Amino acid sequence: GVGTVMGAKRLKAIVVRGGQKPAIADADKFKDVQDRVMGQFRETHKDTPPPLRVNGTANTVAIAQAFGVLPTKNFQQGTFDKWENIQASTLRDTLVVGNKACYSCPIGCGRLTKVTQPEFAGEGEGPEYETIYSMGSNCAIDNLSAVTKANYICNELGLDTITMGSTVACAMELYERGYITRKEVGFPLKWGDGHALVKLTKMTGEMKGFGRDLALGSYRLAQKYGHPELAMVSKKQEFAGYDPRAEQGMGLAYATSPIGASHMRGDPAYFEILGIPTLLDPLEWKGRAKWVKVCQDLSAIIDASGICIFFTMRALVEQKMEMRPFGIRDYLEAVTGFDYTIEELAQVAERIINAERLFLVRAGLNRKSDTLPHRLTHEPIPDGPGKGYVCHLEEMLDEYYKEQQWTVNGVPSDKKLKQLGLT
């Protein structure tokens, strides 16, 4: 992608500076919509602040632990026995020094933190839940100071924290099984070693020593040492912090995401563990494809609109999965000057999903690419509420392709493409 091209050219950034304000088709309508939306928001939270403002995304640690979906030791387990040391309240009470919000945001989900433990000292933003999972429980590390320091390094060097933590977790399992040794790494690499995490993160950013291998990402790292099955990836991208053996819909979302495993292209956690708009059994796979498709469609609309997913996704799902609440349609109409029906917005979402799928098909991807590691589909999760379960991906794919009106091999049908004007 573009990132690869920029990296090859050693291009660090592209800066665009405009001299004009963006035009709004109907400024008065936009103000009315904004007043209404913010009024609803203030009314909803008149007695209690938004949970994301209080604890940020780290709230998810306790929820994931309770549902047995907190990835631990490179997805060998779904619960972490030292989870309380990395939960939101621990972060808040020991490291958080303030909140951070995007411009004019009423939520303020960001965390400003400061680490005083000498060997990990520093200050900055984060960590978010996905960082805490990937560098914490997934590496069996319960030292939040170490996790936060590694997070700072990633922020400064432009590294993705999910990929970084997951790749270290993969390396730790390779080391545990004897597939790599101290000779390759340069020092012992064992579960729970926060100092090793920080050291390897810096080595990766600087492309030094074993860091060069880690910079390959977990798939190519595991492949290099002869065990690609230990890379917890889909389409070679590392997972977000939910074990799909105990959260079936998330497994389908991971496998069918056009960019590889991602919770940002459709997040079934809303109805599988958060109970929005209703709590579905996370262990049930039958009928789950319909809900996953709805989440993916909503995410596509939110991405295309440029509105924050935290502010809109929850609101959209709370309103029975319709694309009308909290003014998303009204915002679009006020800014663009176009009128949108719910049906038109739904078709825009489907057009985005199918156009992306067509790109993948033409690049040679198909059903065989919509996959998960053997561990998640064949090795039952050993702990938590989902103990004994695997992810029923193949069965869900059959349902999903029918919902999308794609072929059994995952190719958009001519009928569907004609319906969307993509022929």
Identify the residue ranges that each predicted region occupies:
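Extended C-terminal regions of large enzymes
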Residues: 1-423
